[in-house]
């Protein structure tokens, strides 16, 4: 059993390439729209989106299909959930993989305080997302523009773009991302239109509420049932992913203390499942079919 957790602003649809490949390789695959997204519930209360609730959703899925354990794979914010769920429910996840975001230790201060210490007076999108209202309205005004700009987020080596994203000022988030003038080569119009239709229907508040739980998550994970992840763990990243610039990847083994591995895809950006689906699928299958990992997964399903 493999459970796939999408990120922001994504959907279960974002895993469409991997679902087929994993199923053809013999795995049972669950790829839900997570709470706040797509066809799943969108509770109004911000506290409904804590990492404990999101992790409990995954356990509930396993219970629903009668599976005691699963390998857990997450991308972007889905990787945050994937790295946290084995700490909260260590008996339910036999292996874990995170895409674009590696496992990082819990900061010494609440997460938004840690971000403010790093970014100071500069603009940082996660801090902008904290206040209900402004970001919700900005992203929902024109979902096609929102998604087109987010999917075209520049790579880490685009210094001018990085400066635009950080410069203090009254403008919101999207104005800092240049209009790309078209779709990136990794997504066609039909697939893009599906995203637009879904986010036009649901808007972005449920998705943004995940970000508004950062500090509450910090409180809730102070003393999890497991202090570290001892299950086999894999991080898959893109060498051109701008988000890695502010992620302490060098501390990953403080969290994943068992069999931890990394695969960096040369030239890849942030949207790995769609930008380089074959590379991602190959890395996942090499991990899942490794004799050590495979034995653990198979023994957990008996």
Put a short name on every predicted segment.
Residues 8, 12-15, 77, 83, ...:
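Signature tryptophan residues that serve as conserved aromatic anchors
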Residues 259-302:
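Catalytic active-site module of serine/aspartate enzymes centered on a nucleophile-bearing elbow/loop
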Residues 1-41:
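Conserved HGGG/HGGXW glycine-rich cap/lid loop of the alpha/beta-hydrolase fold
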Residues 37-73, 77-260:
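Flexible "cap/lid" subdomain of the alpha/beta-hydrolase fold that forms the substrate-access gate
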Residues 31, 237, 264:
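Conserved residues in the N-terminal Rossmann fold of short-chain dehydrogenase/reductase
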């Amino acid at each position: 059993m493999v459970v796939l957790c999408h990120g922001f602003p994504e959907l279960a649809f974002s895993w469409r390439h991997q679902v087929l490949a994993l199923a053809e390789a013999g795995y049972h695959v669950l790829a839900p729209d997570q709470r706040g997204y797509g066809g799943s519930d969108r509770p109004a209360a911000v506290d409904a989106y804590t990492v404990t609730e999101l992790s409990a959703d995954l356990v509930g899925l396993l219970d629903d299909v009668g599976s005691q354990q699963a390998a857990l794979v997450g991308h972007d914010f889905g990787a945050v959930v994937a790295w946290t769920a084995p700490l909260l429910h260590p008996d339910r996840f036999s292996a874990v993989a995170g895409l674009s975001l590696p496992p990082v230790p819990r900061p010494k201060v609440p997460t938004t305080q840690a971000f403010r210490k790093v970014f100071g007076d500069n603009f940082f999108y996660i801090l902008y997302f904290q206040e209900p209202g402004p970001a919700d309205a900005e992203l929902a005004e024109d979902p096609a523009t929102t998604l087109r700009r987010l999917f075209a987020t520049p790579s880490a080596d685009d210094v001018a773009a990085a400066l635009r994203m950080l410069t203090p000022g009254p403008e919101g988030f999207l104005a800092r991302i240049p209009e790309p003038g078209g779709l990136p080569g990794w997504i066609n119009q039909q697939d893009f239109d599906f995203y637009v239709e879904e986010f036009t229907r649901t808007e972005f508040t449920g998705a943004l509420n995940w970000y508004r739980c950062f500090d509450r998550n910090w409180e809730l994970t102070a003393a999890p049932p497991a202090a570290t992840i001892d299950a086999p763990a894999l991080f898959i990243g893109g060498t051109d992913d701008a988000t890695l610039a502010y992620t302490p990847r060098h501390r990953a083994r403080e969290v994943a203390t068992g069999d931890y591995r990394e695969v960096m895809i040369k030239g890849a950006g942030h949207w790995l499942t769609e930008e380089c689906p074959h590379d991602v699928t190959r890395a996942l299958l090499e991990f899942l079919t490794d004799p050590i990992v495979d034995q653990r997964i198979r023994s957990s399903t008996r």
